[in-house]
Amino acid sequence: MAQKKGGGSTRNGRDSESKRLGVKVYGGQSILAGSIIVRQRGTRFHPGVNVGVGKDHTLFALANGKVHFSVKGALNKPTVSVVAAE
């Protein structure tokens, strides 16, 4: 009698779906108002001029223009601004 024992079970095989976080528009690139600049968890990047913050800490443009990254303050916080197009 050809037989095979039970294959057993595994406890592996799960992983969470990636959240696609990170910088979406880089320094010097043009952007339209309402477009997402950075998707992040917490305020790794802080909002500057013409940049708004969503409830999940997403940074988005409040005006058309060019994205500008800088470091500000005594704590050297990375800040994102949008220099408005004339």
From Swiss-Prot:
Which PANTHER family does the entry link to? LARGE RIBOSOMAL SUBUNIT PROTEIN BL27M, RIBOSOMAL PROTEIN L27
Instruction: Give the taxonomic lineage as stored in the record.
Output: Bacteria, Pseudomonadati, Pseudomonadota, Betaproteobacteria, Burkholderiales
| Gene3D superfamilies hit by this protein | 2.40.50.100
Q: Which ranges are annotated Gly residues under compositional bias?
A: 1-10
Its name, as the record gives it, is: Large ribosomal subunit protein bL27
Q: Which HAMAP family match?
A: Ribosomal_bL27 (MF_00539)
For this chain's UniProt record, which GO biological process terms are given? translation
* Alphabetic keyword roster: Ribonucleoprotein, Ribosomal protein
One Pfam family name is Ribosomal_L27
Q: Where is this region: Disordered?
A: 1-20
Gene Ontology molecular function: structural constituent of ribosome
